[in-house]
Amino acid sequence: MTRKGIDVSHWQGTIDWNKVKKAGIEFAIIKAGGSDAGFYTDSKWEANYKGAKAAGIPIGAYYFVGKDCVTAAAGKADAERFLHILKGKQLEYPVYMDNEAQPASAKAGTTEATIAFCKTMEDAGYFVGIYGSAVSGFKERMDDTKLTPYAHWVAQYASKCSYKGDYGIWQYSSKGSVDGINGNVDMDYTLVDYPTIIRSGGFNGYTKAAYDDNTSTTPAPVTPAKTVDELAKEVMDGKWGNGTDRKERLTAAGYDYSAVQAKVNALVKSRNRLLSTTP
């Protein structure tokens, strides 16, 4: 099912989240902070987090890195700052590294910084992703072939998304109009049920679902091995984690990670073809 969302920051001023909810918005990605003007927390982060939560709108967050985030050390430092801002909060959508400021000439360094950022966030228990434009971001500023383990939020203001890789959210306009928000707002679509994946997986401040808790002392019944198709569906439902965690868990369970991931990629591409023509 396609879900319509928005992404916001202090630029949208004071938002009436109840009106936003009534306008049919089903999720929001909120700016938490950045490093493009020194380390800072977005001035509307707390108000937007509390307002969206109170209105019952599932949320994610993003962190805008500066032009100097072109080393692994810088990526790790930005992630640690992001973690500080997110402490004590629960988010139903991924937490994103926003790569827009780094120059194309620093592509290799930006890629290293991005991997370090994402690994730091993953190690802290977050479902992490990367934001970038379909062309100038993932093609010119980053080596996207090294970033496939992480969720992608792709920006392309057009009637369809031409990005060829796997992505979870498409930002299709910067000139949306939504009741409760003064002026223009970025608009997004997703076909991924991130809230279920994140809550059941115990990411982003949530406790892992009780049914997936392995602390019971009662021996588990022996079950037959699952097919690749069955495993791929479970991966899509968030039952095998994300990134390196997914690979380790599938391998430890005796399954062929490469075969399962190939099936997942095929399913995601099929879903993306549908998403790319949504507007």
Regions found by a protein language model. Give the residues of each.
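Repeat-associated, polar segments at repeat-unit boundaries in modular proteins
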Residues: 253-275
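Structural recognition of alpha->loop->beta junctions
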Residues: 81-96, 101, 141-167
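Disulfide-bonded cysteine-rich modules in secreted/extracellular proteins
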Residues: 222-240, 269-279
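Functionally critical loop-and-helix segments that line ligand-binding/catalytic clefts
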Residues: 1-18, 145-222
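Aromatic-lined carbohydrate-recognition surfaces of secreted/lumenal glycan-active proteins
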Residues: 121, 125-139
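Substrate-binding cleft of extracellular glycoside hydrolase catalytic domains
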Residues: 1-118, 122-126
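Extracytoplasmic Gram-positive cell-surface binding/anchoring modules and repeats
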Residues: 234-247, 255-257
